């Protein structure tokens, strides 16, 4: 009988974690209009792939995974890896969700130097 409260609490935790991760899932547009990215579940994390770029000379970027292994920190943020297709380098990545806005960061030197990109939800 004491097992039921534990199972109920665990079920709520799993549901809440899944719902929280789903909040960032969807299509996002860079505020500067340069690209769109789709955030979707991949395994036990979130990943983001480029779905559109404004620059007609860069169609090869479409389909590239630019965020991966983004695991929820439980507070509307995710930590993982970010890939910059412009320089081909991988960075420590972070996503911060605030309603219909998303900020992504790529950092080096343990987070001392970061570059941020602002996104808005488009679906």
Per-segment meaning from a language model:
Residues 24-93:
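Central antiparallel beta-sheet cores of small beta-barrel/beta-sandwich binding domains
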Residues 92-114:
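Short, exposed beta-strand-loop hairpins at the edges of beta-sheets
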Residues 122-123:
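Short, solvent-exposed mixed-charge patches
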Residues 7-15:
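Bacterial N-terminal signal peptides
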Residues 15-21:
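Sec/Tat signal peptide C-region and signal peptidase I cleavage site
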Residues 21-23, 76, 98-100:
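A short, compositionally biased
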Residues 1-5:
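Positively charged n-region of N-terminal signal peptides that target proteins for export
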